[in-house]
A protein has these predicted regions:
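Extracytoplasmic/lumenal acceptor-recognition loop(s) of multi-pass membrane glycoenzymes
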Residues: 367, 371, 402-483, 575, ...
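Hydrophobic/aromatic-rich transmembrane helices and adjacent perimembrane loops
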Residues: 61-64, 294-329
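Membrane-embedded helix bundles of polyisoprenyl
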Residues: 64-73, 77, 83-178, 182-197, ...
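Signature aromatic-anchored transmembrane alpha helix within multi-pass, membrane-resident enzymes
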Residues: 190, 324-365
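Active-site-proximal, structured, solvent-exposed surfaces of multi-pass membrane proteins
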Residues: 534-642
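Membrane-interface coil-to-helix junctions
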Residues: 1-67, 108, 447, 451
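Membrane-interface helix-loop-helix junctions at transmembrane boundaries of multi-pass membrane enzymes
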Residues: 182-183, 256-288
Length: 642
């Protein structure tokens, strides 16, 4: 399923370059790499009024033509024949890994698939001269076709690394094998992802995050080993989808196998074995848990590894000519010369088979979404594949609170308290958001959940506080529990339509004082959290007499006049990076009574400034900006006139 993006580009941009992750009760660290990438890619469209969410949806829907168009230019490295290049681009755009990633809404995998041919073409080398038919026979054209320069390769590697962080070490190894100077191509991606790699490497519990794509996790049915060898990262949902994807994957293996028998070279054998190893590695990595999706363990989505495998098979098939490479060069026809009828017929048949299989996958996807209009939105959101939603997953009341200066959050409850199971999710956006976490935080959340299940104790104070309050609220509700929820800046509580145990959950919430029932909406049943009539806020000032004053701000900072004094409390995890000042005078941090939130002593009223800062954030921003600008300038130089 596709995660949501902020409604405005400015909010996405701020989250991308922040040292604080605005998800749940907040985390210290760099943003998800896909957040950074989407902030950059969507920047040109922001002045047109195109939201990041609409742009991401377009990238998913148009992933097949985008992959075909991007692969067309790099395909010149493999062959000069337009027919061969067309077949290679068509096959690449209909690869099983890409089609399933688009169906499951995994944006990172689709972008990685599109960028991979550019980087591979740079590593393979410059294209050979075109052969033209002259008066004296077949001769080389005086000018070589343009290849992929270092700037284009650097930007492609940035996309690949942001989508699948494990690709950067692999890509750096390939660049080092090509030449030491080529390692400069990996510098922009390395600088951009330094916070991600440091956050993962610093905690062994986060190491599994390297196995998956960035941009969120989702629970899905893993593919069998033979399906992975055919390029499928997940089990097909219908027999039609299985047959169509199987035809494409098996066709790629068959074409590469025939090419291997014809070429009989070490490079061909290495490419074929490398493709099998990449597919096997992808299947093995899919067994690794990398996060939590609802009440389930989410395993690594390894489509980029299967794309690498499929790409190696296509390279081998496209480069096949005859048994000896020297003979191929000697007997190559002109680039636009006529081919034998058998070859042309085989190419046309291959194109028809690919298009038919792609149509089968599309038909299967549309058939699976046929019941979307009659299915509750929350149930659709729990599916592993994407579906159109007839109503928003968040009610208008909750959405308004989120967009207000209080930055209210939503507590979503699922499960059955009669069996001792309550699932609680804290949302800052319209469902799980791209800015909610990072690969490291998701892997750590899974590790903490497993540790808590084994030991019976949650070691993170914020998580323990929310879990205890959510369960108590529906079983033995009291005023203190509602106040605890307000301390987490929970403005509304949602029991979605289609949630399991909704009747028992609703019964418990109706008994709780301090909750105002809004009623039944298209999203589900909604309550406002109002302990003692106080409106929750992300930032508040509590006076010594017990008066609470909400303070307006954004998800990441506060700047404004506050007519109150006492203890300044943030509904964010305590961290030494938080800085607060009143009229330019720094406030002293203090320990909050709840044991998890950030607090400051605020003796006087005045103009409050509250930000989060880390020592590394400014140097990282500057270095990233310089590297990206240099790479973009180098890429644009490829289009200068000769």
């Amino acid at each position: 399923r596709q995660v949501s993006l902020p409604s405005s580009w400015s909010e996405l941009w701020a989250a991308a370059w922040s040292a604080w992750i605005p998800g749940g009760d907040g985390y210290a660290g760099g943003a998800d790499p896909l957040t950074i990438l989407m902030a950059i890619l969507s920047a040109p469209f922001a002045p047109m009024g195109i939201t990041p969410g609409a742009f991401a949806t377009f990238l998913l829907v148009a992933s097949t033509p985008i992959a075909a168009m991007v692969a067309w230019i790099p395909s010149r490295v493999l062959a000069s024949s337009l027919r061969v290049r067309f077949l290679v681009s068509l096959a690449w755009s209909l690869a099983p890994s890409l089609l399933m990633s688009a169906t499951h809404g995994v944006l990172a995998a689709t972008l990685a698939h599109a960028a991979l041919p550019i980087f591979v073409a740079y590593c393979v080398g410059q294209p050979k001269p075109l052969l033209v038919a002259g008066a004296g026979g077949i001769d080389e054209a005086p000018l070589r076709p343009r290849g992929i320069n270092g700037g284009c390769a650097a930007l492609a590697l940035v996309v690949l690394a942001c989508c699948a962080p494990w690709i950067l070490p692999l890509g750096a190894g390939v660049l080092a094998w090509r030449s030491r100077r080529s390692l400069l191509v990996a510098l922009p991606a390395l600088v951009l992802l330094v916070p991600t790699y440091v956050s993962i490497a610093a905690r062994p519990s986060a190491w599994p995050a390297l196995a998956s794509t960035s941009g969120g996790v989702h629970a899905y049915t893993r593919a069998d080993s033979w399906m992975a060898m055919l390029g499928m990262p997940a089990a097909p949902s219908t027999p039609l989808e299985a047959a169509a994807l199987g035809i494409i994957g098996a066709g790629g293996i068959a074409a590469a196998g025939i090419a291997l028998l014809r070429l009989r070279t070490r490079c061909a054998a290495f490419a074929f074995c490398g493709a099998l190893v990449a597919a096997a590695t992808g299947w093995a990595a899919a067994q690794i848990g990398v996060g939590i999706s609802g009440a389930f363990v989410a395993h690594a989505w390894t489509a980029p590894a299967l794309s690498l495998s499929f790409g190696a098979l296509l390279v081998l098939a496209a480069r096949s000519g005859s048994g000896n490479e020297d003979e191929v060069e000697a007997s190559r026809p002109a680039w636009d010369g006529s081919r034998p009828f058998t070859v042309r017929a085989l190419g046309a048949l291959s194109a028809l088979v690919l298009l038919g299989a792609g149509g089968g996958v599309a038909a299967s996807a549309f058939a699976a979404r046929g019941d979307a209009a009659d299915t509750p939105t929350f149930t659709l959101a729990q599916r592993s594949t994407v579906s159109p939603m007839s109503s928003p997953i968040v009610s208008a009341v909750a959405s308004q609170a989120q967009r207000s200066t209080r930055a209210g959050r939503i507590l979503v409850l699922d499960g059955d308290p009669t069996t001792g199971t309550v699932n609680a999710f804290l949302w800052r956006g319209s469902g799980p958001s791209l800015t909610d976490g990072s690969p490291a935080t998701r892997a750590l959340a899974l590790a903490q959940a497993r540790s808590g299940a084994a030991e019976g104790v949650l070691r993170d104070p914020a998580t323990a506080s929310l879990a205890q309050a959510a369960y108590t609220l529906v079983v033995y509700p009291d005023d203190a529990t509602v106040a605890t929820l307000a301390a987490h800046d929970i403005d509304t509580i949602l029991v979605p339509l289609g949630a399991s145990g909704s009747q028992a959950l609703t019964s418990g919430l109706d008994r709780a004082s301090g909750l105002e029932k809004v009623g039944d909406t298209n999203s589900g049943t909604v309550w406002r959290v109002r302990p003692g009539g106080v409106t929750p806020s992300r930032v508040r000032v509590e006076s010594a007499s017990g008066v609470t004053t909400p303070v307006g701000g954004s998800q990441l900072s506060v700047s404004g006049d506050v007519d109150a004094s006492g203890t300044l409390i943030l509904a964010e995890r305590a961290d030494s990076g938080w800085r607060a000042s009143v009229d330019g005078t720094a406030l002293a941090a203090t320990e909050a009574a709840d044991g998890w939130s950030q607090a400051f002593e605020m003796p006087t009223a005045g103009h409050l400034t509250l930000t989060y800062s880390a020592w590394w954030i400014i140097p990282w921003r500057i270095a990233s900006g310089v590297c990206l600008v240099v790479a973009a300038a180098s890429a644009l130089s490829a289009w200068r006139k000769r």
